[in-house]
């Protein structure tokens, strides 16, 4: 293998039989120049990607310490073992960049809170569990105090790297929309629905919203008889009113349209939550009297 480009003293671009690869090794680029030979004994890790990914990785290695790349690789290996599936190659670059960027913020005393953390934990529970492990690993391995909020961001990267899943932008958009809806529901019901008495109904609502968004994206809408929708409107007027406000939010802020059937289905889930809140308030009142 011959050196084509030196990124830093521990990372170089090599030509291996006409194929470009990124080679990592302690001191591999030190006191070397273009066309110098590199041997297997010099290499700790080697990365082969599609041309676009290779260029992005090269640009990244020009700017960051390669230990962030190694850490991201370890997290991905762990994720693939737990999930029993391969992640796409692009997640390595995105996760490396994120870990390095977060480290810079932390070292500068900047802590970015993840306002979508609760929704991410419910929507992507498998990925979130892996991300929690990753936060502990990063803190120990790099000596940088990554926060619990970081698990949410890492979970999104892992989710976007899974085969056949949404890309990172779409995953974040999905969580953001659901978070906005949850805030609207909390405002209407005047209750923190994340709290313990309502955790099950909260999880059910979040999962329903995820499926609703997926159906809307695929234009495969829920089937609900017109009679059932009308019954829901009569029987659960408050919840149906909230579902209509959600439709306005989706249309105005995200240019998403949902059908009357989806509206009725959503109202049923909101009513389940609203009823739980009412019952909890009654129980609390009874306890206060006693």
Regions found by a protein language model. Name each.
Residues 1-290:
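A cross-family "folded-core" feature that marks the main globular domain of proteins
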